[in-house]
């Protein structure tokens, strides 16, 4: 009975390895699939955006 269990486990591992190699389920997503416009200036643009005062109609009271 122990040999049968080991045989079944080895078969399951081999089949899962075959599926991983043949399938494309683990391919990384394309980096340019969704363009990100939330930070077009890069790190320096993000820093300048933090340093820049926020647009506020009542600037002295914006805090």
From Swiss-Prot:
UniProt keyword annotations, A-Z: Amidation, Cleavage on pair of basic residues, D-amino acid, Ion channel impairing toxin, Neurotoxin, Secreted, Signal, Toxin
Domain remarks: The cysteine framework is C-C.
This protein's GO cellular component annotations are: extracellular region
Q: Which residues carry this modification: D-leucine?
A: 58
Species of origin reads Conus textile
User: Please, which domain of life does this record's source organism belong to?
Assistant: Eukaryota
Its name, as the record gives it, is Leu-contryphan-Tx
Q: What does this protein do?
A: Its target is unknown, but this toxin may modulate voltage-activated calcium channels (Cav) or calcium-dependent potassium channels (KCa).
Q: What is the lineage of its organism?
A: Eukaryota, Metazoa, Spiralia, Lophotrochozoa, Mollusca
Please classify the protein's predominant subcellular localization into one broad category: secreted
